[in-house]
A protein has these predicted regions:
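Extracellular structured ligand-interaction cores
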Residues: 52, 114-118, 134, 328-329, ...
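Serine-hydrolase-like catalytic core of hydrolytic proteins
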Residues: 2-14, 106-278, 282, 311, ...
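A structural signal for well-ordered alpha-helical segments within the folded catalytic domains
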Residues: 50, 114-117, 192-195, 199, ...
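Surface-exposed helix-capping loop/turn segments at secondary-structure junctions
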Residues: 123-133, 205-214, 274-278, 393, ...
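Short, solvent-exposed turn/loop segments enriched in Gly/Ser/Thr/Pro and often Arg
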Residues: 218-222, 430-438, 503-512
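Non-transmembrane alpha-helical segments in soluble domains
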Residues: 136, 195-198, 202, 228-231, ...
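Substrate-gating cap/lid region and adjacent catalytic-acid/histidine neighborhood
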Residues: 250, 284-475, 487
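Non-catalytic accessory segments of hydrolases
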Residues: 2-6, 11-191, 212, 359, ...
């Protein structure tokens, strides 16, 4: 069924940098109270960074605030410790552990709790009192289902690019996106958390040396879906000035719906709540324990996303984009060249898929996520992607290409076109580098997989501390880290990724130019336009011909 969740998780986890040897950490005074953070040092940089962890931006969403819009955090007395990561929002920790192993990571995740609406701030320590630095506001990925702020250490990016990095958490899964479509549970709770966190930045970021008038929202996978959604929401107007979405866009799959009760009934079933009335259903869910929701999540992976509620979202994403009635800000967006290469098919493809597949197996997986609304459409798509396949390995490669295109690449390219045609400056990339640390973990056919770009954006080459990536980066990859931090830092500062010492990144205009991000960067043109044309034009023609026979 269409409601089956594809866990578009973000899988690159982060690391804490080593605390600098100082007697006491930095103190910042906010209107809600004071915070004591810690100084951290960054490999390869002379700058120290102030790190503030677990800052509350909302009241705990528990009791009557469960399945409700978030409320701003309340003031606290005294000096609040800001040196520990907050608990993760409710999720299945077994999934995070499994993903970590696949990604060659070694770290101990924190506990999970409904009381999870916190954010982390990383800011360069050596700055003048009058200096206001641009802000990158990062939203984690994980299919709107898993993940958390602990996965990202913003200190390397903050030090190298002299920017303020904010990493937030938001409610996930059932508690983040459940909706009955009426006044009892309008939904979009996780997106509303993101809006409140942006409002917190507007009110508080100057205390950390940040500029509230220069905020870039950024994210990957579900984080990219989120930043894309925020450009469509009237609630986010004036809260940010540039946007980055990596391997995710608002049009991806069925991430926005006008009919949330289809999914609400599935939730009612796994939580054992009466769905005969929406009032009874929501009342029952507010009485459930945290463990009840974790058990429900383990029982069935439920797709939940944005609901057209008339408040956060006025219409489904595609219709808003077509109308051009959205926030026109500079956009940087892109994909990897093998989005469905390894991590995602490990979950959804049949056993032994990596050795080779047949057409029947391809059709079975595709049918899980794309049930045929028009007879014959899936066969036509499979025909296109397998037309040159001669061996089981060829079929496997066509399968991974097809699923990557349908789930991520084509939606991102379409959204890029909508923003460009509405008058926004757009910069597109394809990340093509296969990280060295996966050379002995992944099969040789896997190229740049989903989320492989994120570590380079955050300077993973220079991570050190309690959370480790098992493997090594080459000297060429160290330079790629610096290059990508440079591009992202420039965009956060100016709305353009270009700057001294970097290969020119062309705008994504009517000529469809983009940048190939490899050890050596090059300009490209017409990314996947042949497949976009097939899916938008040729497929309809073939279906018409099929009906005529």
């Amino acid at each position: 069924m269409r409601g089956v969740l594809l866990i578009l998780w973000l899988t690159i986890a982060s690391v804490w940098t080593a605390p600098a040897q100082t007697d006491s950490g930095p103190v910042v005074v906010l209107k809600h109270g004071s915070l004591r953070g810690q100084y951290v040092t960054v490999k390869g940089s002379e700058k120290a960074v102030e790190q503030y962890l677990g800052i509350p931006f909302a009241q705990p969403p528990v009791g009557p605030l469960r399945l409700s819009a978030p409320k701003p955090a309340e003031p606290w007395e005294g000096e609040r410790d800001a040196t520990q990561h907050p608990p993760l929002c409710l999720q299945d920790l077994d999934v995070m552990e499994s993903v970590s192993k696949i990604m060659a990571l070694s770290f101990i995740p924190p506990t999970v709790s409904e009381d999870c609406l916190y954010l982390n701030v990383y800011t360069p320590s050596q700055r003048s009192a009058a200096e206001k630095l641009p802000v990158m506001f990062w939203i984690h990925g994980g299919g709107l289902y898993m993940g958390g702020a602990i996965q990202y250490d913003g200190s390397v990016l903050a030090a190298y690019e002299n920017i303020v990095v904010v990493v937030i958490q938001y409610r996930l899964g059932i508690l983040g996106y459940f909706s009955t479509g009426d006044e009892h549970a309008r939904g979009n709770w996780g997106f509303l958390d993101q809006v409140l966190a942006l409002q917190w930045v507007q009110q508080n970021i100057e205390s950390f040396g940040g500029d509230p008038n220069s905020v870039t929202i950024a994210g990957e996978s579900a984080g990219g879906i989120s930043t894309s959604m925020l450009t469509l929401s009237p609630l986010a107007k004036g809260l940010f000035h540039r946007t980055i979405f990596q391997s995710g866009a608002a049009t991806l799959g069925t991430y926005s719906t006008k009919h949330p009760m289809v999914f609400a009934k599935v939730v009612a079933n796994v939580t054992e709540c009466d769905s005969s009335s929406t009032e009874l259903l929501v009342s029952c869910m507010r009485e459930k324990t945290e463990e009840d929701f974790i058990k429900a999540t383990k029982k069935q992976k439920i797709f939940l996303g944005a609901t057209v509620d008339g408040v956060f979202l006025k219409d489904v994403a595609e219709e808003i984009l077509k109308s051009k009635n959205f926030l026109k800000v500079p956009v940087l967006l892109g994909v990897t060249n093998h989005e469905f290469g390894w991590i995602l098919p490990l979950t959804f493809a049949p056993p032994g898929w990596d050795k080779g597949m047949d057409r029947q197996e391809v059709a079975a997986v595709m049918g899980q996520f794309f049930p045929e609304e028009v007879s014959g459409v899936n066969d036509l798509i499979i025909d296109e992607y397998l037309k040159d396949a001669k061996t089981p390995e060829d079929v496997r490669d066509g399968f991974t290409e097809m699923m990557g295109d349908l789930f991520m690449v084509i939606p991102v390219i379409k959204v890029a076109g909508y923003h460009r045609d509405a008058g926004a400056h757009v910069y597109m990339y394809e990340f093509q580098h296969r990280p060295n640390l996966f050379k002995d973990i992944r099969p040789s056919f896997v190229k740049a997989d989903h989320a492989d770009d994120v570590g380079f954006v955050f300077g993973a080459c220079f991570w050190s501390g309690q959370i480790k990536m098992i493997g090594t980066f080459t000297e060429e990859e160290n330079q790629l880290c610096k290059t990508m931090m440079g591009y992202w830092g420039n965009f956060v500062r100016t709305g353009s990724p270009n700057g001294p010492g970097l290969v020119n990144w062309p705008t994504y205009d009517q000529s469809n130019k983009y940048l190939n991000l490899e050890l050596q960067q090059t300009a490209g043109q017409g990314l996947r336009l042949d497949k976009l044309h097939f899916l938008n034009v040729e497929l309809l023609q073939k279906l018409s011909a099929l009906r005529a026979t």
